[in-house]
Regions:
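Conserved beta-strand hairpin/beta-sheet module of binuclear metal-dependent hydrolase folds
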Residues: 4-61, 156-168, 172-173
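Divalent metal-coordination and catalytic microenvironments
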Residues: 34, 44, 54, 75, ...
């Protein structure tokens, strides 16, 4: 698969691009499926009510929802964590999120960018992540990189063997490649710029 930057993903990592209408705008987001020795790990799950698009993306990769064993949520926003409740109901996946993100996912805190009267359905976080946690995958190690700024407890995922980065919203991307964080959508811009510098120190290809 390919992400919006045109970056080629290593074998075992698949782009699950999801397109939704947001009023007048058409928005495309990029959950990913990562194959591991014990099943598929989803990195983010997309909008509420759009799990069928995740299923379709998995099918395009020769995978199925029944292959999914875990979901790693990069941060609390509804376009990344919104479909979690439906996913857990249907598959019983293990949910991972950073320790500072977990309260927003599980309902102890209200998602910081959601209106007070609405949020996606809360879901228990089974395992709370910290910086440096490593997953074994078909594409080699997948390392959790703590990248706060855009949202509390934001993480990115780095594959050192291929130099691949799933930045989530720590960076922005367009046709010309990766760029720094978007000030418009970032809670703590100084933290976000520090996070971008940390990512820049990694081997990215």
């Amino acid at each position: 698969g390919r992400l919006e930057t045109g970056m080629t993903l290593p074998a075992g990592v698949h782009d699950l691009a999801q397109t939704v209408q947001q009023g007048e705008r058409t928005v495309t987001i990029h959950p990913a499926a990562v194959e591991t020795p014990t099943g598929v790990v989803l990195v983010d799950v997309g909008y509420p009510g759009e799990l069928d698009q995740v299923e379709a993306g998995l099918a395009d990769a020769g995978l199925a929802l029944g292959d999914v064993r875990a979901a790693v949520i990069t941060h609390q926003d509804g376009d990344h964590a919104g479909a979690l409740a439906e996913l857990v109901d249907r598959t019983g996946v293990v949910v991972y999120a950073h320790e500072l993100c977990a309260p927003y996912v599980d309902g102890r805190e209200h998602p910081v960018k959601s209106p007070e009267d609405q949020r996606y359905e809360p879901v228990d976080v089974d395992i709370e992540l910290v910086d440096g946690v490593r997953f074994r995958t078909a594409a080699g190690p997948m390392d959790v990189v703590f990248t706060p700024g855009h949202a509390p407890g934001h993480v990115s995922l780095h594959f050192p063997d291929s130099g691949t980065l799933l930045a989530a919203d720590a960076l922005t991307a367009d046709e010309s490649g990766l760029a720094g964080p978007s000030e418009e959508f970032t809670l703590e811009i100084e933290d976000a710029l520090d996070s971008a510098e940390r990512l820049a120190e990694r081997d990215l290809r």
